[in-house]
Amino acid sequence: CPYYMTYSGCCAGNSDGWKDNLKPEYYEEFAHYLVDVCKHYKDEYGIEFRTLEPFNEPLTNYWSRNGGQEGCHFDISSQIAFLKVLSPILKESGLNTVISASDESVLSDSYNTFEGYRSAGVLNLIGQWNTHSYYGNNKDRSKIRTLSQESGLRLWMSETGSGGSGISGNLEMAKRLMNDVNYL
C-alpha cells in the first residue's frame, strides 16, 4: 500500500513485522486504488484481470520497515475487515474480476486463514483461493484442497520455490510441483 496509508510511513512494512501496516482509516481508499488499477488496465489496454489479490503472504513477519521488498502484514481479522470494504467496491466497478485470497507462504497458515474466513462468513466475498507452497506438507495441501472443494472456490497455487540451486534445488522444485499437482 502507498506509504502515506501506513503506520510506519514505509511500504516495506511496519516497524514490527508481526503488526499490520495499513491503517484501517485507509481501507476504503486502498480498495479504490486497487480497483482503479484493474479498471485502468481494462480501459487502456483491453486487459481484464480474472482476479484481484489484495494480500501477499499477509501472516508472515517478512514485511518490516526499510526492508528490501514492499509488503504488508495483515492479521486474519484485518484481512476480513478489508475484504468487507473491497468486495462492494469491486462489485460496483462493473469489472468481472473477483477477489482472490490470501496467498500465505505457509500451507498451515493458508488453511488457518481459510478457516478464519469461513468462521467469519466471508468466503462469499472471494472467488478464488490462492496459496503459496513454500512451507508445509502433503497433509496441509490435502486439507486446503478439501476446504476449497467444499466451498466451491477455485484453488490456485500462485507461488513456490525450492530455495536451492543446482540439481538439488531443481529436484526439490520438481518434488514441490508434483506434490502441489497431486495434493492441492
Language model features by range: what are they?
Residues 1-118:
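Substrate-binding cleft and catalytic face of glycoside hydrolase catalytic domains
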Residues 33, 82, 110-113, 125, ...:
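General structural feature for long, well-ordered alpha-helical segments within catalytic domains
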